Curated annotation (Swiss-Prot):
<feature type="transmembrane region" description="Helical">
    <location>
        <begin position="115"/>
        <end position="135"/>
    </location>
</feature>
<dbReference type="InterPro" id="IPR002524">
    <property type="entry name" value="Cation_efflux"/>
</dbReference>
<feature type="transmembrane region" description="Helical">
    <location>
        <begin position="185"/>
        <end position="205"/>
    </location>
</feature>
<keyword id="KW-0926">Vacuole</keyword>
<dbReference type="GO" id="GO:0005774">
    <property type="term" value="C:vacuolar membrane"/>
</dbReference>
<dbReference type="InterPro" id="IPR027469">
    <property type="entry name" value="Cation_efflux_TMD_sf"/>
</dbReference>
<keyword id="KW-1133">Transmembrane helix</keyword>
<comment type="similarity">
    <text>Belongs to the cation diffusion facilitator (CDF) transporter (TC 2.A.4) family. SLC30A subfamily.</text>
</comment>
<dbReference type="InterPro" id="IPR027470">
    <property type="entry name" value="Cation_efflux_CTD"/>
</dbReference>
<feature type="topological domain" description="Vacuolar">
    <location>
        <begin position="136"/>
        <end position="140"/>
    </location>
</feature>
<feature type="topological domain" description="Cytoplasmic">
    <location>
        <begin position="243"/>
        <end position="258"/>
    </location>
</feature>
<dbReference type="Pfam" id="PF01545">
    <property type="entry name" value="Cation_efflux"/>
</dbReference>
<keyword id="KW-0472">Membrane</keyword>
<dbReference type="InterPro" id="IPR036837">
    <property type="entry name" value="Cation_efflux_CTD_sf"/>
</dbReference>
<dbReference type="Pfam" id="PF16916">
    <property type="entry name" value="ZT_dimer"/>
</dbReference>
<keyword id="KW-0813">Transport</keyword>
<dbReference type="InterPro" id="IPR050291">
    <property type="entry name" value="CDF_Transporter"/>
</dbReference>
């Protein structure tokens, strides 16, 4: 391809056709990658090797790329990487057996529960020490950090209760399980933390308005302050490092809280010391900064988890993965009609419509649809999949979602 021709789709049709690109079933990720690299402009071609995975193409070696061009090529490479992952999943024996999956899930669950218990025990111990530090120093910033630890203890209990609730299974009362409890618990947790921020903000502003300096700390009080706050910071940092590697969303909430505590401890300590040594108002100003940070940080967490409960569409790369998986699933699939994926808690619900031959026997069609459903549900991002089998794709949508929505007419 000419180095200046930027209009030909790199993954599109032959001969610079302006028709929309059509992906053929016989096309493999390797052939698509080779075609992609062969059509790269000269200034980019040095960063690619047809025998290497798409993810290994180094665009940093390409010279003269604008930011927009770089983003475009990165998106194309990401698409090829998705196709390669799907083809790897479709290889015989690539999916783990049910026994292996259960063993892995059991191991991850034990690790998650261990992280939760350690975090809760640490929160209790740190709360006791911070209460003592607050009484000894009388610092507003330290008091804000202590209130944060109190809510850590309460909210940690909520998260752990949420985890235990998810473990109890009753297929008659909750046919699809209780995974939705997870984002609900995180929302409650985050809402409590944001409420703490408002309370601390009000108290700090009141102290600033009163314009009254507190008493200076004694050397003994400073020693207690340094010892407790620095110890708490080190413990919280270690817990953050321990929890952040978990794939469990509840443990991730713990990790975020531990990181938040590291920030509040450091800012609270600095504000308390500077307020004692220099200007008294530094202490309440530090508390105001912590309060604003708390409100913004945890309000964002509330929004992120609330969105997962209202059926937000999956990102385009997820839809591409599902479409490619459905297309590569079986040569008897004539067409992939519809692919939908939307959040329903922490994971996605997936709907796929495929077209088969009108003359195909019911048992054969059922086997194709069921095996595709099994493949999709083994993806780590998917909770449930629904595969609809049809013999044509010109019909109207089966579901009447809009009829349930409020009228937009005034």
């Amino acid at each position: 391809m000419d180095g200046d021709d930027r209009r030909t789709p790199l993954l599109g049709g032959e001969g610079g056709s302006t028709r929309p690109p059509s992906l053929r079933r016989r096309d493999s990720a390797r052939s698509l990658r080779s075609t992609f690299l062969s059509r790269l402009p000269d200034k980019v071609r040095g960063g690619g090797d047809p025998e290497r995975p798409a993810a290994d193409v180094d665009l940093t070696r390409a010279k003269g790329l604008s930011q927009g061009e770089k983003e475009y090529y990165e998106k194309q490479l990401a698409t090829l990487k998705i196709f390669e992952e799907v083809e790897a999943l479709c290889m015989p024996g690539e999916f783990e057996s049910d026994a292996e999956v259960l063993e892995l899930e059991d191991k991850e669950q034990k690790q998650s529960e261990s992280a939760m218990k350690i975090s809760n025990y640490a929160n209790i111990i740190l709360l006791v020490f911070k209460v003592y530090a607050t009484i000894k120093t009388g610092s507003m910033a330290i008091a804000a950090s202590t209130l944060d630890s109190l809510l850590d203890f309460l909210a940690g209990g909520i998260l752990y209760f949420t985890h235990l609730t998810m473990k109890s299974v009753n297929i008659y009362k909750y046919p699809i399980g209780k995974l939705r409890v997870q984002p609900v618990g995180i929302i409650v947790f985050a809402a409590i933390m944001a409420t703490l921020g408002f309370q601390v903000l009000i108290q700090a502003i009141e102290q600033l308005v009163e314009n009254k300096a507190g008493e200076k700390m004694t050397p003994e009080q400073l020693i207690w302050l340094y010892s407790i706050m620095l110890s708490a910071t080190v413990v919280k940092l270690a817990l953050y490092i321990y929890c952040r590697s978990s794939g469990n969303s509840i443990v991730q909430a713990y990790a975020k809280d531990h990181y938040f505590d590291v920030v509040t401890n450091v800012v609270g300590l600095v504000a308390a010391v500077l307020g004692d040594k220099f200007f008294w108002w530094i202490d309440p100003v530090g508390a105001v900064l912590l309060a604003v940070y708390t409100i913004v940080n945890w309000s964002g967490t509330v929004y992120e988890n609330a969105v997962t409960l209202v059926g937000q569409c999956a990102p385009s790369d997820m839809l591409q993965k599902l479409t490619y998986l459905a297309m590569k699933h079986d040569p008897r699939v004539r067409r992939v009609d519809t692919v939908r994926a939307y959040s329903f808690g922490a994971l996605y619900f997936v709907e796929v419509d495929i077209e088969l031959s009108e003359d195909m026997r019911l048992g054969e069609a059922h086997s194709i649809g069921e095996s595709l459903q099994d493949k999709i549900e083994k993806l780590p991002e998917v909770e449930r999949a629904f595969v609809h089998v049809d013999f044509e794709s010109t019909h109207k949508p089966e579901h009447r979602v809009r009829s349930r929505l409020p009228s937009t007419e005034p």
